[in-house]
Amino acid sequence: MSLRGHHNSTNVLVETASFLVVRLGVSYVALPADGVRGVLTREEAGNEQAVTAAGTIYQPVDLAQRLSVVADLSGLEMRTVLYSNGHSYGAIRVEQVVALTDVERKDCLPLPPQFQCDERNWFGGMMLYQDQLVLLVNPSWVLGELAEVVLASVGQAEQMVAATPAAVGESC
C-alpha cells in the first residue's frame, strides 16, 4: 500500500502444468492431467481388463509391471485411471491416486545423468510433491506407443527415435 492508500501490484504470469500424482508401491509418478478422462473405483471399473466408459474402450495398461515395481492393487485405495492422448486409450490401475496438482514449470526438473537410454523415453522429468520425488511419465510410453518403435523396421525406427524428444517434450 502506498502513502495515499492505493495498492501497487503487478500481475505476474506464471506458467504451470497440471499433473495427476499416483502411487505404485513406494514409487510416485505423475501423468499429465490433460489426458485424464476419469478415475474409477474398483466397483466402477469392474473385473474386466478393458474398461468401457462413454462408448470408448480403454485397454488395460500394467504400469507397475512396465516400471518393474511391486504394487498391491487389492487395497481399498486402488483406482483405475482412464487415460488418453487423443489416439490411444488406456485403463491404468494404480495403488493410490495421491493428488491433482498444478506445478510451476520452473519446479519441473530434468532427469539426472543417471537416467540413460530407454529411461529418457519413459520419463520426461521429475518434481517434488510434499517431499516425495515424483517421476513425470511420458504418456506415449505409458500407452505403449513407443513400444511400436521396437517393432518398426530399421529405417522407420531411426525416424521414430529422431522424433522421440519432441514427443517427450520439456520436463513439464
Per-region residue spans from a language model:
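An acidic, low-aromatic, low-complexity terminal/linker signal
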Residues: 1-172
